[in-house]
Regions:
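Active-site entrance/lid segments in N-terminal catalytic domains of soluble metabolic enzymes
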Residues: 1-180
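Single conserved hydrophobic/aromatic residue that forms the stacking wall/gate
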Residues: 184-194
Length: 194
């Protein structure tokens, strides 16, 4: 990979992916499938998956036929069985809990890796205001352009907000709070958005 950042995605680390990635983010998802603190310390960053642009506010349903032996091993699940992911993190009730979770990850990694929050583009201004107060290093606005193999067709194909459409509201939310936070979107992960 030519200097690109790669994310583990939903479900753990693939050793070869980590080995060949110059920058690798470990994604912490709602279901905690495949979560391993030993893998977290191998990461260049941690991304908390809070929402996905192509299915904002929805959990996931991965059909059993997609749970191959490799997927099952990464996620610590039985192969061939349907799997569901909740829409929210079960140990968070609100922004205060998220701030505590960010602090836990910072302490577990000795403050050596940045923390990113992935938000689905929906109520961008309000969501970013809450997220920034939790003190992440960056926020990733995921627009409807992203894909998923675990969502209802109507949500993944016919709804959503484009990532670039959410950037203006996200930037305004950060500026209104007088805070500083890197901002990215799936359309243009670029420091010019910061």
């Amino acid at each position: 990979m030519a200097g690109t950042a790669t994310c583990s995605g939903e479900g753990g680390m693939i050793p070869d992916e980590r080995r060949y990635s110059s920058k690798w983010f470990y994604q912490c998802i709602q279901s905690r499938y495949g979560f391993n603190p030993h893998h977290l310390v191998l990461a260049d960053g941690c991304e908390f998956f809070i929402g996905q642009g192509c299915k904002v506010g929805l959990g996931g349903h991965l059909m059993g036929q997609k749970v191959t032996d490799q997927v099952a091993e990464m996620r610590s699940l039985p192969a061939g069985i349907d799997q569901r992911s909740p829409a929210r993190h079960p140990d968070w009730l609100g922004p205060d809990d998220l701030a505590l979770k960010i602090q836990e990850i910072r302490e577990a990694t000795d403050w050596q890796i940045p923390i990113q929050l992935k938000l689905g583009a929906a109520r961008v201004y309000d969501d970013v205001r809450m997220a920034v107060k939790c003190d992440p290093d960056s926020i990733y606005i995921d627009g409807m352009e992203g894909g998923t193999g675990a969502g209802p067709h109507l949500a993944t194909e016919d709804t959503g907000v484009p990532g670039m459409a959410g950037i203006r509201q996200a930037r305004k939310a950060i500026d209104d709070l007088g805070k500083s936070c890197l901002l990215y979107t799936s359309d243009a992960a670029d420091d010019r958005l910061s």
